[in-house]
C-alpha cells in the first residue's frame, strides 16, 4: 500500500461512490459521507481510513480487508486491477490473450471473478470463467492444461484481527477480520520455462501495477454482460485424474483415511482422488461441505487451532490408519499418524516431517532416471538436502513462497514447512494439498504392505541423516515498527551469543543473498540466519502478510542405530524449548 494520508478529500469520496457498481459498498460510503457532513467524527475517521491508502498489486497479487474505498478489496479495486492486467497482456501479446478465472465459496468472490471475466472480455481477451467455486490447485492446473496466458483466483477468507490476538491461537476463529485476495498467475506465452504457470514475481508484478495505476475512470473500461467461456466439470474431472495419477501407483494394502476438508472447496475432489487409487475414505461430515460463512482455518497450526480434533476423534472411532486435512482452498495439507507414545494415540506431523517422507518418496522415484531436483524454502528443514544427496540428486534452496519454489529448474518435488507441497510440478506449479494427500496416503499403504509405517520411515531417515526437529516461534505485535526495530537491533550487534547453550558460530544476513545450494545466490530478502556449534539453526524474518516476527528453529540430534529415536526426539524437543526461550529474551517482543 501507499503511505497513509489522513486528510479527507470529499470530492474523491463522491467520485468513488459515483463509479462503484456494488450497491452495498456504494451505500456504505454514502452513509459515511452523510454522517461526516453532519459532523460525525467516527464517520470522518472511517472515511479517512478507507481513503488514506491505495491497495496495490504485489507479488502476492491483491490482498486486503473487504470494504469500500481504494485501500480495501472491493469491486472497483478489482475492476481496475483486471483492466491493468488486460493492458499488460495486450501489450505483451496483442489481442486474443487467454485468462482462466476462478473463485472460492465465500460470499462475494463470485462477483469479483465475474467482473474480472467481463473486463478481460471487454479488452479483447479470452476469459475462461469457472462455472462454480473451485480449489486453487484446480485453477493452477487449468492454466497449464489449457495453455492460457494468465490466471486469476478471487477469494475471500479470514485472517487474524488487528487487536494483537491471533486466530491461529483460538479454537473458534469467528472473530477474525476478512481478508480478500486476487491472486495472479502467468503462463502460456508470457512466461516460459520452470516458472510457467506459477504466481507472479518481480518484475511482472511491478509492470502490471504500472498499468493498473494508469487506469482512469471506470466509464472507460468496457464491461460486457457476456462473452466469456465457462469451465465446468470436465476440467475438474481432468484435475482429479491428474491428482490420482500423481501417486504413480494404486494403494498396495487396504488403508482407511479420515479426511477433513475444513469446509472448503477441495473436499469432494480430494475424496474422489483418494478413492480412485483404492483407498477407503471416511470424511469428517461437519467439515466437508463448503461454507460461505466459515472462517478460514490456519492449517499451518492445527495443533493450536483445534481444527483437527473432530478428525482425530473420528479416526479413533473408525480405526483409521491415517488422518489428512486439506486447507479451505486445498493448497495445504497436514496429516496425523497413529503413535502409542502420544496422548490420545495420534501424532500430528509437522510440515517438515511430511516434506521429509514425500521428499524421500520423490527421490526414490527420481533415482531411477538419475535426474531431478528437490527444493524447499530456506526456512524449511535441511533434511531434504541430505535426502537428495543420498539419492544422487540435486537440491535447491528457495525464498519462502511457492512462486519461488516452483521456479526451480528440473523440479520433481518442492515443499515449504507451512504445509505446502508440490508433488507434480508438470501439472500444477503451486502448492497442491490434494495431490500431496493422495501421494502421502498411497505411500502409507505401500509401507503398510511391507509391515512398516510412516513413523518407521521417519525413524529410519533420522538414523541415516540425524533427527531434524523443527518448531516455529511467531511473535505478533500491534505496532509493525517494533518488528523493524528488532531486525535492526539484531543486525547492529544484538544477535544472540548462544542458543540452547551452544555458541552461535555463524550469522548470515539474507539481504546479502543466500546460497541456492548450486553455486548461485537467492534474491535479497529481509531475514537473518543463526547457526550454532551444535548445528542448530534459526531463521528470523518478518512476516510478509501480518504484523509478526517469525523464527524458524531447527535442531539436529544424531541417532545411533541401536538407540530409540524417541529418546532423540525428547532431547530435540527440550533443545527447541530452550532456543525459543533464548529468542524471546533477545528479541524483547
Predicted regions mapped to residue ranges:
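N-terminal small/polar loop signature for handling phosphorylated ligands or for N-terminal nucleophile
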Residues: 100-179, 273-335
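Phosphate-binding and adjacent anionic-ligand microenvironments
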Residues: 170-171, 179, 316, 320-322, ...
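Conserved phosphate/anionic-ligand binding catalytic regions in large, soluble enzymes, centered on
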Residues: 51-71, 156-157, 177, 261-269, ...
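Short acidic, glycine/serine/threonine-rich loops at helix termini
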Residues: 110-115, 140-144, 162-190, 220-223, ...
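Gly/Ser/Thr-enriched, mixed-charge loops and adjacent short helices
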Residues: 16, 20-27, 46-55, 165-309, ...
